[in-house]
Amino acid sequence: MTTINLKDSFKAYDVRGIVGETITHETVRATGAAFVDVLGLAGQTVLVGGDMRPSSPEFMDAFAEGATARGANVQKIGLISTDVLYFACGIENAAGVTFTASHNPAEYNGMKMAKAGAVPVSSETGLFDIRDLAQKYLDEGSIPTVENPGVVTEKDVLKAYAEYLRKLVDLSNIRPLKVVVDAGNGMGGKTTPAVLGDALLPALPLEIVPLYFELDGTFPNHPANPLEPANLVDLQKAVVEHGADIGLAFDGDADRCFVIDEKGNAVTPSAITALVAEREIARAKAEGNEQPVIIYNLITSKAVPELVEKLGGRAVKTRVGHSFIKAVMAEESGIFGGEHSAHYYFKDFFNADTGMLAAMHVLAALGGGNQTLSEISASYSPYVASGEINSEIEDKAAAVDRVRAHYAGAPVEVEDSDGTTFTNTEEGWWANLRPSNTEPFLRLNLEAPDTPTMERVRDEILALVRQ
């Protein structure tokens, strides 16, 4: 009998818990069994991989025990980034799981799951059903074994992943570039040499300067979360010191990628979204797609939909969160999607997100001409953004109401979708207030035509929120 409640570790999109407390050998084994039962995978192959966290190998074994007991064959694909799992699930048309807690601290681990074709498993597509059945197995103290349990095999998919990405974006003929890559001791330390280096494939015209490529799930240098500006400082310094053309920072499971220009300044994910959208629209039109669809979330710069429409594409706005983007990508036949959090989704990558492929598009744009990255990104960044500002506040609804009351009667449109968005059409600014689902935070994102307007509106709204 167990006292662990799986509701503590099963979130809306994935599983995350503290090793030995809310995620253990037993909970993972039960989850492996429930994964097979709920998704009907008996007799089929389930892919199992994991990141560099110390507990990942044991958890991969535990999941395999549960999955094979219920009749699935397990193919272990070893040490992988999360986008390698999506690639393998897509190319092999098989369901799978990877053990990672992304950028969470060292004491955490977790699971990201996908159905065949890299379709995400979330609370709305079976994750909570898996949780409930796993809880039943835990409470009963045993997992029934089928008459013909599955077998475990191993396969390395990293070279196939690297070849696949190189076919999507050809970097072989770009001008030579010096690229500093901060892997943050995460899985980018393994995928970067495979895709951009010469570890598995012929060398590209890229000189890679590695930062923190040693796989180490204790993150000895800095947290592997490039969304926090403090974690980009080492990369920014290195880009300037080495006279590099560009810097890339990956998070722990290497599905997100942040970009630094040659001056050491961060390039916003909105600018990267616009850059990649322009390249993908041109390619889709050349292939006969008359109005390619680009997906963006409501916190992305309005420069993105403006550019997409100017190029003859169609821009579709969605809520924040990868399951929403992936669902809309499929529904709308989108060719590319971008989020302010540096998640980038590609139709050619099974509608899944891959920071590496986005980085390759940036390298192709940079290496295909003579402009610097700061010059290129400036053309995609006509507006001034506040970045995401958190206010710790208990009564979030009352705070939003104060802002709503303040702008009543002004030329401000109010839209209640994924928080509340205020748009001033006369002054050309918009602001979104969105409550965090997991923390007592109200998040402000704001964009304006110039810095004085952005700062004035930002200070106005924060004063109302925090009073």
Regions found by a protein language model. Give the residues of each.
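Glycine-rich phosphate-binding loop
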Residues: 94-108, 113, 239-261, 265-266, ...
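N-terminal small/polar loop signature for handling phosphorylated ligands or for N-terminal nucleophile
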Residues: 42-109, 195-260
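Short glycine-rich phosphate-binding loop at a beta-alpha junction
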Residues: 43-51, 178-181, 292-298, 335
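Gly/Ser/Thr-enriched, mixed-charge loops and adjacent short helices
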Residues: 109-242
